[in-house]
């Protein structure tokens, strides 16, 4: 897969303190450092969404057509590569990280679609990224068969929940509340947004799910249509503080009643055409073709 590359420049200087740079990335969570005779690489991967980026320091410039750019800005031989197929939620998180990096070392970003080296601007970077992404999607139909396009608001809630999972697990660890990940199943047309839980446990219920897999004591597993009973169980759910709207928890005092209602919902038959996908295969697109 292609990447979206941003180069970094500095005004009237090429100097970047390497020790400060190494310490900067050493203090960044989930970043690994690699180096050899060709480059130094700082690799980040989101711990629950599994999308990442890579900063690279090279011995010489890799900027195309550098001589057409303003001489007031000098290439510091650092660039970042981002996945070209990335949802807007994670892209915005990565932009915030890039903004911090630019401010820390007084850098200015550049992409070949820019007129010149520019100050960091969220809107400009977002417009150019999504322009490049759109062209990539149009050209790679076969690759896109494994991706799902969701309504932007639905996708935002799902990614915000996944982004919060580790904090939720820490918040609930002392009271034995299970924090499930999404189980996503896709057959090329329909997306099933599910969770799998054990019968009777206290659990968080993420936003936007339509199916609950319940594993019974005999280890059998049933898929229940959550949408059919969502309104019935709503009074039993407690809103989880400090996270995205639609995130609730089933507490012990109501768990028996909750599971009785869920197990009266229609049982879904999941066709073998459905395959498991990860949330990183979800993209947002406005319009009538979106899956809600």
Describe each region flagged by the PLM:
Residues 1-50, 148-150, 154-161, 289-292:
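Short, extreme N-terminal segment that most often corresponds to the first beta-strand
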Residues 23-88, 214, 219-235, 239:
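Short, intrinsically disordered low-complexity segments
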Residues 15-20, 123, 225, 258, ...:
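Secondary-structure junction/capping motif
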């Amino acid at each position: 897969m292609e990447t979206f590359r941003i180069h970094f420049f500095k005004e009237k200087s090429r100097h970047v303190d390497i020790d400060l740079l190494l310490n900067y990335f050493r203090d960044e969570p989930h970043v690994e450092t690699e180096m050899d005779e060709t480059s130094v690489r700082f690799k980040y991967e989101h711990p629950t969404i599994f999308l990442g980026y890579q900063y690279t320091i090279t011995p010489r410039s890799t900027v195309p057509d550098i001589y057409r750019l303003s001489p007031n800005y000098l290439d510091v031989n650092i660039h970042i590569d981002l996945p070209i197929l990335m949802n807007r939620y994670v892209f915005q998180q990565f932009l915030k990280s890039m903004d911090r990096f630019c401010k820390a070392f007084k850098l200015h970003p550049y992409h070949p679609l820019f007129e010149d080296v520019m100050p960091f601007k969220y809107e400009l970077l977002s417009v150019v990224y999504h322009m490049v992404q759109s062209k990539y999607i149009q050209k790679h139909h076969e690759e896109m068969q494994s991706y799902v396009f969701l309504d932007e608001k639905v996708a935002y809630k799902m990614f915000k929940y996944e982004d919060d999972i580790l904090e939720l697990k820490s918040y609930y660890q002392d009271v034995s509340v299970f924090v499930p990940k999404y189980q996503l199943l896709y057959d090329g047309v329909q997306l099933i947004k599910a969770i799998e839980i054990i019968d009777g446990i206290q659990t968080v219920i993420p936003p936007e799910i339509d199916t609950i897999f319940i594993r019974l004591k005999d280890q059998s597993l049933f898929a229940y249509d959550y949408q059919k009973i969502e309104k019935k169980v709503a009074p039993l759910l407690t809103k989880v503080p400090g996270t995205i709207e639609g995130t609730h928890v089933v507490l012990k005092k109501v768990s028996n009643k909750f599971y009785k209602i869920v197990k009266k919902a229609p049982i879904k038959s999941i066709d073998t055409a459905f395959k498991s996908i990860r949330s990183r295969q979800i993209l947002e697109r406005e319009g009538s073709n979106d899956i809600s």
